Amino acid sequence: MSTKKIILKSSDGHSFEVEEEAACQCQTIAHMSEDDCTDNGIPLPEVTGKILEMVIEYCNKHHVDAANPCSDEDLKKWDKEFMEKYQSTIFDLIMAANYLNIKSLLDLACQTVADMIKDNTVEHTRKFFNIENDYTHEEEEAVRRENQWGFE
């Protein structure tokens, strides 16, 4: 028995043929599928081909059924390796997971970022997120005094 396929079109013109059941982990796509709006492909103007390929890889792995069994332990190991593999594009993955409404990928990517910055200094976190410190030295000291408990 053949599985229905749908075409996903990235913002930069790449097209990907994906099993509908795997793609429907994206709630955005699932709603379009329910409304029979998939015949001509689904344009995804907020997701590049590079990132869409990663999202599809994630969805294919997480589409577990009789033909594609996977234990929770194996899936957790795969998720960890997936995040390590795509660490340099993690913020793009977060944006795509949010846009496509893939809660499990969004949660995984956000937790990965949280784990990456926990126990780091403010300066390291600023550098990690490329945030410029716009406080004067005096303002920064005042904030530290007012919130001393947070720096202990």
Curated annotation (Swiss-Prot):
GO terms for biological process: auxin-activated signaling pathway; jasmonic acid mediated signaling pathway; protein ubiquitination; response to auxin; response to jasmonic acid; ubiquitin-dependent protein catabolic process. It is found in: Nucleus. SUPFAM superfamilies: POZ domain, Skp1 dimerisation domain-like. One of its GO terms (cellular component) is SCF ubiquitin ligase complex. Pfam families: Skp1, Skp1_POZ. Part of a SCF (SKP1-cullin-F-box) protein ligase complex. Interacts with CPR1/CPR30. Involved in ubiquitination and subsequent proteasomal degradation of target proteins. Together with CUL1, RBX1 and a F-box protein, it forms a SCF E3 ubiquitin ligase complex. The functional specificity of this complex depends on the type of F-box protein. In the SCF complex, it serves as an adapter that links the F-box protein to CUL1. This is SKP1-like protein 10. It comes from Arabidopsis thaliana.
